[in-house]
Amino acid sequence: MADSTPVRMPRAPKLRASCDECGAAKLKCDRGHPSCGRCISLGLKCVYGVSRKAGKPRRDAQSATRPPPTPGDSGPPLDYNSFGPTSPPSSVGDGATLASGLLPGAADLSPLDWGPGSSSSYRAVVDLCSRYAKEPMRMDDTAMSSVWDGFLEPSLFATYGSPVQVARLAGGSVPFSAAPVRDLPI
């Protein structure tokens, strides 16, 4: 009994438009075959290598390697650990960048929520933490202290303790430092 599946011949690899020598020198190749004009004049071996561009795979090859999507499949789950910041903030204005790296959704806060003299920043950060934490975040959590470290006036720490305590006691009228604490001379 004969197999009804058509036999496909393998495609010949696609060659580069420019020869390897002109490509390496980043010069325009005249694409002459079997040798381009530049290679002939310089006495070089003219080779047209395989193209590095793969192109689009054929449609039937795509469907064979990937299962069909199931209804209600929203894609792979997001890994929120991959959103972390690459460096500590360098100024007060970078607080939103830090928080958006730590908390998905913090980037939605306006710049006014993070500037000096802000009164709603603390509540916004606690709200975001509570939304994305598996358990509601305690107000004195050390993770919150690390978010606010460097943004509150240093004199407040001596009187009230942690940044979280300062923010809680101030009730939304927390004085902010013009420069992060870590940048102030000791």
Curated annotation (Swiss-Prot):
It comes from Aspergillus terreus (strain NIH 2624 / FGSC A1156). It is found in: Nucleus. Residues 52-98 are annotated as: Disordered. GO terms for biological process: positive regulation of metabolic process. This is Transcription factor pgmR. One of its GO terms (molecular function) is DNA-binding transcription factor activity, RNA polymerase II-specific. SMART domains: GAL4 (SM00066). Its main location: nucleus. Keywords: DNA-binding, Nucleus, Transcription, Transcription regulation, Zinc. Transcription factor that specifically regulates the expression of the pgm gene cluster that mediates the biosynthesis of cryptic naphthoquinones derived pigments responsible for the coloration of the fruiting bodies. Residues 19-46 bind DNA. It comes from the Eukaryota. GO terms for cellular component: nucleus. InterPro entries: OAF3, Zn2-C6_fun-type_DNA-bd_sf, Zn2Cys6_DnaBD.
